[in-house]
Amino acid sequence: MSFLVDLGATSYIACYATQQAVVARRCSGDLDRDCFLLTEHPPVYTLGKRGGEQHLHISKEMLAQKGIDVVSIERGGEITYHGPGQLVLYPILHLRKRKMRVTEYVGLLEETMIRLAADFGVRVVRNTRNAGVWTEDGRSKIGSIGIAIRHGVSFHGFAFNLNTDLEPFSWINPCGLTGVTATSLAREAGTDFDPAEVKKRLLSIVADLFGEFTVVDSLHSVK
């Protein structure tokens, strides 16, 4: 059975290193189960394989002043923002063993966020040209997806804006798209949410779409 670890608030670099270690174990067969990492990051911009630094509209001096790092990684896509108030899920799944196509997998990530928003009274939709989930008018993005695949094993995942401070999104073209704004579940619903309550619902949806899993306290307990 798969397992899930709630890492709590973790730096992006530390969590990235954790992903790399788990992916290596899953690829080698040392780890024979799929894994979900649930976390939240301090403010950080990440750049995907297509780069995206040209979509950053804030000086390096201002970034340093605000304590926001910029990290280049191998996921798909361009620039995005992570920060407090997001739900970030990194599924490390052996797609090959699951006989799951990448397009099917991305669709399930989108469906996870669509159902999560709906459970709290907010309707969001897919965009056929851009991965992630959006408001019905297609102008605002509430959830971003960026993944990578190594030897049939997925990593990275999605970031869903819950009670997120949206100002840092205004300093970039999110995912390299002009004319797009970011929104959050709190903004769309007009109220803040208890993260613990939303997490509980998220775990239920993940189990429904990807199969049952056990929740473990730490990766150290997983053999």
Swiss-Prot record:
Location in or out of the cell: Cytoplasm
Positions of substrate binding: 75-82, 144-146, 157-159
Q: Give the EC number(s) listed in the UniProt record.
A: 2.3.1.181
Q: Which residues form the signal peptide?
A: none
Q: Which GO terms describe its biological process?
A: protein modification process
Active site (catalytic residues): 175 (acyl-thioester intermediate)
Q: Has keyword Cytoplasm?
A: yes
- Keyword Transferase set for record: yes
Reactions that this protein is recorded to catalyse: octanoyl-[ACP] + L-lysyl-[protein] = N(6)-octanoyl-L-lysyl-[protein] + holo-[ACP] + H(+)
Site (Lowers pKa of active site Cys): which residue positions?
141
User: Main EC class of this protein?
Assistant: transferase
Where this protein primarily resides, as one coarse class?
A: cytoplasm
Cite the NCBIfam families for this sequence.
lipB, PRK14345.1
Protein role:
Catalyzes the transfer of endogenously produced octanoic acid from octanoyl-acyl-carrier-protein onto the lipoyl domains of lipoate-dependent enzymes. Lipoyl-ACP can also act as a substrate although octanoyl-ACP is likely to be the physiological substrate.
Fill in the misc note: In the reaction, the free carboxyl group of octanoic acid is attached via an amide linkage to the epsilon-amino group of a specific lysine residue of lipoyl domains of lipoate-dependent enzymes.
- What PANTHER family does its record include? LIPOYLTRANSFERASE 2, MITOCHONDRIAL-RELATED, OCTANOYLTRANSFERASE
Q: Which family does it belong to?
A: Belongs to the LipB family.
Q: What is this protein called?
A: Octanoyltransferase
> To which species is this protein native?
Desulfotalea psychrophila (strain LSv54 / DSM 12343)
